[in-house]
Amino acid sequence: MEIKYLSLCILAGILFVSQVNASENNGKDDVKYAALTQKDLDALPVEKRASVLDELGFIHEYGLGVPMNREQALQYYKQACELGGNYGCYNVKYAYQYGDGVAKDSAQANKYAKKMNLDNLLIEQEYIDKFSQGIYAAKVLADTDKSQRPEFINALFNLLNNRPESDALFFSRIGFNQEKTFRLATLWVQDGDPQMDYQLGLLTLNDFSGHYVDEPYKARPASLKWFRAAAEKGVVEAQSLLGGIYSGGEG
């Protein structure tokens, strides 16, 4: 299983709210991004423009506030990649490697992978390729099989939670961060899988949304909504977690 490979990579040391309201706020932001014109984009500083193009790629890839359009997502990621290599390059690699919105083309996949900015990354190129391969193999499973989604989100949680800045930078360069993981889980929880309720509880508790930076004490009560939903649907981990909270007089 590819996700087990991710865990092995970590062990080997290669890399050292109301949530309903949060979802609504994200949706409003997605619509604002989608309304940007090329003139708006051209007026932005290069680094900001690359970040916005990456965001446009993400929302079109998953249909967040806009119709899902993998072909359009690819074009945004390509544009982002060309602006310094900090965003989008490995998203393009993924698309060409797996034929996501485009015909498979290993030459194009490698071409865009090489455009990624390697500055300040404490990981050698061979490990970047090997590690990203494991992540993207898990991603394609989650994209094509809904039952794999909770496990993929859990893998991202383990990879991104409480990591050094250098690790966070690496994951961002290949297309993953805490906030995107939270938004994916918020989207996929609509599939009705109780395991996703549990994963969303973990992400909320650890503030992957970034909504509780100034008020971290609010993350715990907000997470209980999702843990309770998971527990009521029979998720043993959620039942155990809530049991510990209630026995301690909390919740």
Can you describe what each PLM-predicted range is?
Residues 1-24:
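Classical Sec-dependent N-terminal signal peptides that target proteins to the secretory pathway
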Residues 46, 64-68, 82, 98-104, ...:
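Short coil/turn and helix-start
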Residues 50-51, 86-88, 194-196, 236-238:
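Helix-start (N-cap) detector for alpha-helical repeat units in TPR-like alpha-solenoids
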Residues 53-62, 91-98, 137, 158, ...:
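Hydrophobic face of amphipathic alpha-helices that form TPR/SEL1-like repeat modules
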Residues 104-121:
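TPR/TPR-like (Sel1-like) alpha-helical repeat modules
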